[in-house]
Amino acid sequence: RFSKLGVKVIENYGRFIAPNILAAGKYHIAAKRFVIATGSRAFVPDIPGLEDTPYLTNDTIFDLRHQPEHLIIIGGGPIGMEMAQAQCRLGTTVTLIEGAQALGREDLEISSIVLDSLRADGVTIMEDTGVEKIVASGTSNKPAVEIHTSAGKISGTHLLVATGRTANIERLNLSAAGVDVLRPPVGQPYISTDKRLRTTNRKIFAIGDVAGGPQFTHSAGYQAGIVIRNILFKLPAKIDD
């Protein structure tokens, strides 16, 4: 699609080799402005037994060819809730485990309505419940998983890990471009930007999941509009607080 519109598409990983030069395969691209919009991937926590257990993420759950009998979801954020409601309404038994408060970053009045709705649908939501260990006990033909939690053992057929997203920044060699990465004590690393979505290298912008903030498609679209106004129209557009 983009090639037909006249856009040169390079299918390779890009990495900065200088503040104004990006290397991608055999290409070295020098530009006055860059926009980093590399998105994110599912964050997988370090839980004993998880690496030896088949699990799903919101990227892979849509590859299922058969409906899960009992889906256990680790993570009570927006992604976990979305998948829980969808699977439950399709007829799957769903148990959701959250280590703190489910939808804890959302408005309390609104999140309460959402949680009540999911519970009315039949979703079991366990809050303030830590996951201690995961054991895979089934076969490829008959999957089974056992979750050891602070509230006891939970058994199911499938496991979905929905503990957030982490920005795709590792391969970019951002230090060569003078772009700072923020590493908060809680949460995943992301690129530091100002209100105009400029990084610490003012010639490089970052939008979407890599820039922190709400990780939603509509948020990235809004940020793209801010960057376009800054780069193409020379307008000092800023994101709203």
Task: Please describe what each predicted stretch is.
Residues 2, 7-8, 15-19, 23-54, ...:
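Glycine/serine-rich phosphate-binding loop and adjoining beta1-alpha1 elements at the start
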Residues 8-10, 56, 124-126:
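General small-molecule cofactor/ligand-binding pocket signal
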Residues 10-21, 43, 127-142:
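A conserved short coil-to-beta-strand element within the FAD-binding core of flavoproteins
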Residues 14, 29-39, 73-74, 94, ...:
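Short hydrophobic core segments
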Residues 31, 44-46, 81-83, 104-105, ...:
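Glycine/Thr-rich phosphate-binding loops of Rossmann-like dinucleotide-binding domains
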Residues 51-67, 154, 158-235:
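FAD-site-proximal beta/loop scaffold in flavoenzymes
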Residues 62-63, 68-72, 78-141, 146, ...:
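Rossmann-like dinucleotide-binding cores of NAD(P)H-dependent redox enzymes
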